[in-house]
């Protein structure tokens, strides 16, 4: 099968350079700064509104109509939620269901790690790249990858 894919960035992992998101109205440059800048309740509401509206099932239907057959979905290391981060598993579950209904495949991209893998805004921490300096953080990321594999391995849209 020839793949015709698109990236669904700035949905579950915020990337300011991509435009419309809670970051686009903030003074900070990364998701960590957003946590520090916005009151907790406001942040949760802004993130949930963004995640529910930025990408929808209508987008998946349109992608299928124009010949796309694969969507790459960047996900954060905190996909299951943490003390500071809202879970986004519901949205990834929805994406898998939408993809299956539209005949699309999903490529999960673990796009962030604790304390950033690259020092860019898409790592959650601008100008910081400290993930690989601690074995516990590395082990945590392996656990996240294994949990994602367990959850979606048998899904027809994978």
PLM features: what roles do these ranges have?
Residues 1-68:
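N-terminal carbohydrate-binding accessory modules
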Residues 37-40, 73-76, 127-128:
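A short alpha-helix capping/helix-coil boundary motif
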